[in-house]
């Protein structure tokens, strides 16, 4: 099991998502628990590595327009949640 760290950017974005009421927080928590357990996400989440300057990061689609950006520190068993939001919010 990975220890989960939330960046300040992630916390701010999550707060906005909660205030919007557009998504169920339980959906986000479910995906984070799967990732933190080290299990592979189901295909429907379209989990993949990013490219270019963000190649150390991964991205998955919690919902079609809700993306989670994260990375692992495998040596210390840490999962860092970097940001969450729509494509236009993140990129």
Q: Can you name each region flagged by the protein language model?
A:
Residues 1-64, 73-79, 88-91:
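Basic, Lys/Arg-enriched alpha-helical interface segments
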């Amino acid at each position: 099991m990975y220890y989960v760290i939330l960046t300040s950017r992630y916390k701010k974005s999550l707060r906005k998502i909660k205030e919007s009421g557009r998504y169920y927080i339980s959906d986000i928590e479910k995906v984070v628990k799967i990732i933190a357990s080290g299990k592979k996400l189901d295909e429907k989440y379209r989990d993949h590595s990013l490219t270019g300057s963000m190649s150390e990061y991964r991205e998955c689609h919690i919902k079609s327009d809700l993306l989670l950006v994260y990375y692992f520190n495998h040596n210390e068993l840490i999962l860092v949640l970097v940001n969450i939001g729509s494509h236009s919010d993140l990129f």
